[in-house]
Amino acid sequence: MASYKSRVIDVTIVNRLRNKGAILVEGAKWCGKTTTCEQHASSILYMSDPDRVKQNLQLADISPRSLLQGETPRLIDEWQMAPKLWDAVRFEVDHRDGFGHFLLTGSAVPAEMEQVHHTGTGRFAWIKMRPMSLYESGESSGAVSLSELFSPDDKPIFAENKATLENIAFLICRGGWPQATFLEGDDALVQAFDYLDAVVKSDISRVDGVSRNETRARLLMRSLARHQGTQAPNTTICEDINVSDDMELSKDTVVSYTNALKKIFVIEDCPAWSPNLRSKTAIRTSDTRYFVDPSIATASLGIGPGDLLNDLETCGLFFETLCIRDLRVYAEALDGSVYHFRTKEGLECDAVIHLRNGSYGLVEVKLGGDRLIEEGAHTLKTVADKIDTTKMKEPSFLMVLTGTSPYAYQRKDGVYVVPITALKN
């Protein structure tokens, strides 16, 4: 059996078990939730165990507390199969001393939320888990720490980057699926296609019991792949499918299918950032579209690393999705979130990492090359100059996040240039 690769949220789980009665770890299928939580559990209930699933569901209906007995922390895997367990866990937490009693994992938002009578406020901690970042999968050296960039100490950075464009294209298409990181070549690449098949054939319908058409689901996924990193509205997605794929999809259908994909954590759009600006510039408030992993986009389009190398514009588009995935993993370990900034005049910043203490950093994503890095640095300085620092902090750092830059370093103008294969939390 493959050995366990440590995850960034391991530390978060340990910390939250010290101060919360229960933790819910949720995220896309195959991203490693169960394996990670197994490392922290003293006893485990697998709700989907085929030998016990029928009995588990019956017990969850008539005597849910009986399923919660066992050494703590007790892991309840795929709890959403029996939503009544939520209230049972909440009740147990209320009537037990101390913290760290339960770990729950879920790969979908339950369809029968009406069976949940209490939100769990104050008892539960919610942790979002995503496919592996490059630091977790071992493809990033971690020589540059995001937390250190937020530090007031202006420490110099330096690291070598040996990643080639071919490496980056492979990592985009392989994705961060833990199982794939133990494989090589085509064996690793096929995992994303298997994930896509599971989504469109089954998961998109199972999430809420609504039967959805596989062909329509595939067409929607293809269109969403073509619109990664954009604020394309549903009407644009409809038009794209109708023109590109010669099939009529109504706006209601797109909304229904998209909402289902969000419930199973396939889609994770990036919210807009609204800073205080010096001028009355209109800021776009629409979310920016992203899959939770770039390999979903390439699998949806049926393409591989070779195709990306022949189309660097598309490669750059999906490289951005990869970087957003990694930045989310690292930012949340620092109690931060990732946003997108764009004005109606077209000035934009690919990622804004905003921490709870009000600190923030501005990030532009560029695949590589001196010209693109220069463009990214210019954009970052332009955005920074527009921020009203009498009403909010100055940015802690400006960073161009690259794929093929040979080094991580700080430019004379203060802008950091960091290869994604050198970054960690």
Regions found by a protein language model. Name each.
Residues W86-P110, H118:
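Conserved catalytic/switch belt of AAA+ P-loop NTPases
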Residues M1-V14:
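N-terminal pre-Walker A segment at the start of P-loop NTPase domains
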